[in-house]
Amino acid sequence: MPSPRHDALTKLFKYRPELAVEILRDLLDVDLPDTSLIRTEDSTFNTRPSDDIEADLVLVLGPPQEPTHAIIVEIQQDKSKAPRQLARYAAALWLLLDCGVTVLVVCPDRAVAAYYAQPIESGLPG
């Protein structure tokens, strides 16, 4: 069950989705589409026959019928979630929306942030 701190951080981005764009674009130099259209999206990804996977928050940039980019906001307070799970989220949403996807991991703890900042080795060529 998510903690009150987890819920508060998730709501911070849910009620002001522009914050995720500002952090990625202005602080982390991520190239994102230039659009003022940002909306929250269902955060459960169904990849049958596997399990449902659910992100904390999904934001979509661009019009509903033609999304230009998606941002998955994940709040991580400990190292309990495998970093590869974040890649699963991104891949599932990329397949679902057919647009670029960025995962923004928000970690109040520096050690946890360092854990999730490591590159994820997929084993895929290229």
Where are these regions (language model features)?
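Accessory alpha/beta interaction modules
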Residues: 1-126
